[in-house]
Structure formats: structure tokens, C-alpha cells
Swiss-Prot record:
Role: Involved in transcription activity regulation by chromatin remodeling in the context of the neural progenitors-specific chromatin remodeling complex (npBAF complex). May play a role in the proliferation of neural progenitors.
SUPFAM superfamilies tied to this protein: FYVE/PHD zinc finger
Major localisation: nucleus
Alphabetical list of Gene3D superfamilies matching this protein: Zinc/RING finger domain, C3HC4 (zinc finger)
The protein's name in its UniProt record: PHD finger protein 10
Amino acid sequence: MAAVVSAKPLCDSEPAIPAPPSVKEDNSNDTKDPEENSNDGSQPAKRRRMSGDSTPSCENSNQDFGSSYFPAENVIEYKWPPDETGEYYMLQEQVSEYLGVTSFKRKYPDLERRDLSHKEKLYLRELNVITETQCTLGLTALRSDEVIDLMIKEYPAKHAEYSVILQEKERQRITDHYKEYSQLQQQNTQKVEAGKVPEYIKKAAKKAAEFNSNLNRERMEERRAYFDLQTHIIQVPQGKYKILPSEMTKVSPYPVSLIPGQFQEYYKRYSPNELRYLPLNTALYEPPLDPLDPELLALDSDGDSDEVEEMKSEKKKTKGSSVRLSIDSSSMNMSESDNTQDTQEETPQPRPKVKEKSSTPRKEGSKRSVLSKSVSGYKPKSIPNAICGICLKGKDANKKGRSERLIHCSQCDNSGHPSCLDMSAELVAVIKKYPWQCMECKTCIICGQPHHEEEMMFCDTCDRGYHTFCVGLGALPSGRWICDCCQKVPATPKKGARKVKNSKEG
């Protein structure tokens, strides 16, 4: 029993050295029972055979383990092809021996592998990685990054051992490189002449300047922005701005009023053209048109903008002439009122009021100019062979088969029967007194613009067009609407007053 116990530690001990036959076995064999020794010798022989069989089996296992041991420094990582485009590989045979895996390909079939070419084998032979006999065999290459990942996941102890070897190799490489550099430096210092030192200094300064310029250029072009790992924000350099002198940016003693009515030095200067758009009392100009309005763009593309400008110029001319006529008529009325006071009481004549509404003086003048233009001897257009645009018939027959005169647009050649246009006789009588416009040519009386058709409304008495914002309305009115021109038409004198005047004159 002592021999069996002594054999187990030998199997668990270091595998390199086999255990010699112990003295305890001989002593145990000598001190056995005399009955066993008195036998034919078969029993002791059997026991010797069993003990002899058990001990060599342990020795064989130790020898196998010792032969399978592969040190980490023998695992070589190389680059193929050796130029800049190469990748790092390891030999599958070395990795399998180091990890102790016999069937490495069957155990890890997903790893990327390839067969070594003849040139690659010769390259490894020059590096003393493989022997001449291994050059004739079929070798397999594995990607080094996949092997390292496999060792980290499944063989951490092997990876720790291999990483220590890599660190030692890196230290040795740095040491050798430093030794070579120091030797070259010693050789160069011995060869340097005293007269060439200024030239070397200039070359060193030039190279340093080139390096600094390249570094600054990379910072400005390639590495301007960077990612902040703490805030996860991409930081971008701020742009350059021109700085004004301190005299121009100096703050005044009263920069802004803190309470309403307090003095402040800052104020905005408005031009006369800008003030006409502001509602100080009432805006004199209509709201400015949107330059990106599709209707306005289409109008400009069709060439109608010239017609609109001509209409504006004509209205300005007629406006000036109407103002002169109104002033002349007012002066004539003033002289007549001074001479004939009794006739003024019987036949009152309308006198233009200058300040009828303090808020809208210019609008009243423009409306009166339109009224005077429409009243002063206007004759409607006459087209002999005109055709109604609705029923497509002439003046001999309308849509009801009756003869009816056509009304004509003052801007274009469109014509139509009043019955087809749903116009009453009173409206037709008023239309003939001023240049009437059809629906396609209709413009606002105040601003003279054809735009904003959805905000255009028409007088029920004279059919003139007005924008809601030109007359101060927020929306289209519902029901009957009469413009100011029709509401302020001067009253016609009575027949009795005319007879009295004639009798007095007679």
C-alpha cells in the first residue's frame, strides 16, 4: 500500500523528471508476511508486475505532458506581405501546440485561415520561424487579432503569459533601438566639424519651422473640430469677427428709457417714404406687396407691370388736375358767395371741406378726385360690333332674346349685357358716368392695384372696387355696402329754387 501512495504524488508532480525507484518499496517487499514469501513466488511476482505497470504509466504521462509543452516565446507573429499593405498572422500549428489543442481546425472552424504560399514560407525560413522540413509541409496561417480574441475569451492564463512575452519583446526592441541611436549619435558627433555647426543649426531651425507650419495647418484644416467625451458635444472653433474701436461701442449715459416718457438718446430715423406706410394718424400708402407673391410674379412675367405703372402715372396726373379743379371751384364758389348772399341761402352749393375727417385727409381728397373725374363729362366707350362675353350675342338680342345695349370695359375690349351681368338700371346709369372696369381689369380705386382679389369688394351703387385694408376694414362686410363716393354725392338743387333764382334774375 505504501508503494501505491508514493506513486500518486509522482504523477501530480512536475512532469519533466521521472521519479526513481524508492527505497520504501524495497523495504516493504522485505517486510512482507512469510507466508507470501514461502509461496512459489507467483504472488510477489504479480505484485511486482502490478507495481511495475503502474509506475511506468505515470512516467509515460509525465513524458507526454513534457513533450507537449510549448513556450509562449515560440509563438511568432509576423506581417505578410512585409510592406505597408500587409496584415499580421500566426501559424496555426504553433497556436495549437501552445494552447494544447490537437484538432484546432475542427474545434474552431469559424476562424479565418489560409494556406501559406512558397514565398511566405521562404520569408519565415529567413526569419528562423520554421525549419527546412516544415517548409515542405502544408502550413496554415491565422489572423493574429482573431487568435488574441480567442485567447482572451477561452484561455486567459495563456493570454496573460503571452502578453508578458510581448511586453518583454517590446522593451528589448526599444532598448536595441536606443543603443543603435546612441551609437550613431556618437559616430556623428565625432564626424561633425566646427565650421559646419551654423549650417546644421539653420537646417534644424528650418525643419522645426516646417514641422510647426504643418502642425498648425493640420489643426486649422483637418482637426478644427473635436468630440468632447464628457458632454458628447462636437466643439467647433469660433469664427473671426472684426472688432470696432472702443469709441464707437461706448455706451451713452441714457441708452434706453426705463419708464415710458423717460429721455433716451437712441431713436430711429424714418424716411418720408417709410412714414407713409406707418399709421401715425392713418397710413397714406397701402401695405407693401410681397415680392414673392406668385400672382405678382406672373403679372411681371406677362408684361402687365408696365400697364400698372401707366395706370399709376395716369392716376397721379388726374389726381393733381382734380385737386387743381377742386381748388379753382372752391375759389369761384367763395367769390360767388360774397357777391350774391341771397341766392346762396336759396340755392346752397357744396363746398369742399378741408378737414372733414382729421384722420383721413389724403384719402378723402383721392376719393373726391375720382368722383370729379367720373362726373366731368365722361363718355363711355362705343364698340359697334361688340359681342357679349356671356351669351355671345350682340346688342340685338340678349340671353332672353330682347334687344339690349352693351356696356364696355374702359381697359380692355370685353363687353356684356347688363342683364347677363345681373346689373340694375340704376347701376348701369352710374357706370356710364365713369371709366368702368370689368372683373378681369378691376383695380382698387384708392391704391390702383389689381392684387389681393380675395380682399377686393365692390360698391353696390357704382360697382367700384376697394380693398378692405385700403378703407380700414378688417374683413369683407356682409350685406349691402356703399362706398364713400356714393354716400357723399352732392345733392341736386330743387326745381323750386331754380325757378326763384330765374325770377329774381328776371
